[in-house]
């Protein structure tokens, strides 16, 4: 969520920066609600002051023995104030809720270093890394034989999309034998690298979260259609009640679309000691996405699935150091690809292609020879205070005052897409797949997968 104080002080700058993202902020609606909020707040404060003055006046009148009629007249006015104050407080709460609803639909402001642009066509390549020779375009040189895509390579090795479709429908995969082992090896290698070399703390998190958690990280309310909603079977739990014993509404639950949600929420509604920053957290989890807006893209294979595994990196950082942390996290994701000897490039996303909560994002794109193109395998973002403000995540600064942390997240990496990249880049002319050296210890020393 954006800082309401920034909106009040410098609305036009906010509007201009949002416009660079292709977002037209409803200035009229904001001004209407803000004017109403100010008016109601001013009237509330006036009535509160009047209440205090009347209480003092009643005491003075009684103290000097004023006529009863005079005392009663003042008391009558005083007794009418609570109802008026309650109505004003309700109106103020309603207006503030409407303001919050407006702000919750507004994306983060882009950092000054983010290039202007409307779509992915205007993203900027920062660098690329190739483990071998390049062709005339600067892309990895051809393999020297007819390249097959990961589906054709993987199916003889234990990748089964037909069985997955019978079990679950489209956009799922089933793996067995050496293929399942390779998938597991990738995840274990990534976790070991992030924890052992890069200093992240491994976490095991829930795969089901409540709506307030998703609200804090920004998935709700805007991306509700992208989530899998969970319906609980069996008997109900004992109903929760408030302090007065009234039943509370049951909170909706969803499958996580990324463990960014659970890892970032570790600091929800907490105040962290400044000396403890940065926090570096990682987890290997399945991720569940409805792909509601995919429009029939990537229906073949493992590129875009309803269920996929990912090793996530999250940093909770001091605001003064968060952009150093962003570059560090990009390097952590790059190192995975380098050790796997997979060609990749780093792209700085333009204003029109960034995610909802991001102030600055880098995408890592891996080379897929069968598609003759680069495909995203990691996205690393600095959300600054956008998530922290929604979830009330703070730290104590040098003055011992609470201040919002900066939250960062990134894939380190998407396991399924890494498997796709290994199958395509490490395939051999006879249909076998060379196991990258860094994965061989996780494969019991196996160097080649053979049909």
UniProtKB/Swiss-Prot annotation:
Its main location: cytoplasm. GO terms for cellular component: cytoplasm. InterPro entries: aa-tRNA-synt_IIb, aa-tRNA-synth_II, aa-tRNA-synth_II/BPL/LPL, Ser-tRNA-ligase_type_1, Ser-tRNA-synth_1_N, SerRS_1_N_sf, SerRS_core, tRNA-bd_arm. Keywords: Aminoacyl-tRNA synthetase, ATP-binding, Cytoplasm, Ligase, Nucleotide-binding, Protein biosynthesis. Its EC number is 6.1.1.11. Coiled coil: none annotated. It comes from the Bacteria. GO terms for biological process: selenocysteine biosynthetic process; seryl-tRNA aminoacylation. Gene3D superfamilies: Bira Bifunctional Protein, Domain 2, Serine-tRNA synthetase, tRNA binding domain. Catalyzes the attachment of serine to tRNA(Ser). Is also able to aminoacylate tRNA(Sec) with serine, to form the misacylated tRNA L-seryl-tRNA(Sec), which will be further converted into selenocysteinyl-tRNA(Sec). Homodimer. The tRNA molecule binds across the dimer. Consists of two distinct domains, a catalytic core and a N-terminal extension that is involved in tRNA binding. This is Serine--tRNA ligase. It comes from Bordetella parapertussis (strain 12822 / ATCC BAA-587 / NCTC 13253). The gene is serS.
